């Protein structure tokens, strides 16, 4: 590989693995077996749940113990379960190395507990949405790990999602005009994220009224280069087309801890939000000086205009 780089003489080098090399030198999402047993009343109230999680780490241990911890934390979902037991294990085998992928253990257990909720709803003849709404954690409830819930909005999220897709008006299954088989489904989950941590962004308003966002949050398919401009556009009341993102370059972009753990929208997004709020204040102060009025007599409107008090 080193010789190939020398031969390239400064040009980009592409490394392509063969099939054997792919399995020997790279990683995969760890296989997992999840067994879940749930106690529930006839009216759909959850009373107990026992979960056993078995991760296959492959030949070496990387992030598997942390993935296992994360999965155990989220194994019961965002539900009120007065009696719960979770046993989570990581095994080493002679297989391909497994490690963390998107979701960090939550993707797998969410699939398990939401499929369990659907099966319970089916057996009891209860609407899957109503079963979830009946059991979701709300502010003041105590989760299975002893945490007191403070900012839970799962109920509101479910209700909003159901309203947006017309849940009550749709049958469970149907065929559309083109002959495609269609169905409906709804699910919810909770995830431990990398909080608290530090994120910085730089938001610059240019002379022509366009906006430039500098952030070290890396775009890898999760949509951060779309999300951050959307937050800025909504905050400043300006067109999305007038906002651009700087390429990530650690030499010039502000510090960000990592682009991991579902943290970019919350951390970088809030940093952009606060920066845009500061821009609004600065523009109002400049306008007050320009027109010789008191700063409190100048406001920034939702559609991006600065106006004085009539």
Where are these regions (language model features)?
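Structural alpha/beta core scaffold segments of enzyme domains
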Residues: 3-310
């Amino acid at each position: 590989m080193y010789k190939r780089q020398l031969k390239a003489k400064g040009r980009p080098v592409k490394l392509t693995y063969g099939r054997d090399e792919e399995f020997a030198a790279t990683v995969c999402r760890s296989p997992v077996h999840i067994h879940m047993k749930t106690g529930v009343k006839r009216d759909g109230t959850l009373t107990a749940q026992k979960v056993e999680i078995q991760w296959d780490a492959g030949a070496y241990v990387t992030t598997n113990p942390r993935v296992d911890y994360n999965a155990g934390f989220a194994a019961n979902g965002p539900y009120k379960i007065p009696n719960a037991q979770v046993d989570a294990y990581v095994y080493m085998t002679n297989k391909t190395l497994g490690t963390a992928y998107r979701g960090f253990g939550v993707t797998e257990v969410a699939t398990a507990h939401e499929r369990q909720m659907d099966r319970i709803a089916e057996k009891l003849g209860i609407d899957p949405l109503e079963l979830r709404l009946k059991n979701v954690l709300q502010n003041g409830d105590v989760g299975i790990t002893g945490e007191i819930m403070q900012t839970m909005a799962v109920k509101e999220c479910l209700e909003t999602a159901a309203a947006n897709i017309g849940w009550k008006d749709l049958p469970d299954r149907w065929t559309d005009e083109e002959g495609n088989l269609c169905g409906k489904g709804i699910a919810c989950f909770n995830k431990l994220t990398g909080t608290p941590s530090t994120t910085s962004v730089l938001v610059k308003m240019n002379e022509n009224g366009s906006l430039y966002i500098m952030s070290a949050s890396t775009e890898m398919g999760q949509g951060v280069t779309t999300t951050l401009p959307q937050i800025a556009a909504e905050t400043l009341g300006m067109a999305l087309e007038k906002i651009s993102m700087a390429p990530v370059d650690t030499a010039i972009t502000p510090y960000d801890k990592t682009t991991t753990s579902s943290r970019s929208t919350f951390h970088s997004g809030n940093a952009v939000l606060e920066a845009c709020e500061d821009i609004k204040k600065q523009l109002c102060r400049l306008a007050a000086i320009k027109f010789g009025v008191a700063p409190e007599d100048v406001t920034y409107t939702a559609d991006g205009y600065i106006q004085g008090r009539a």
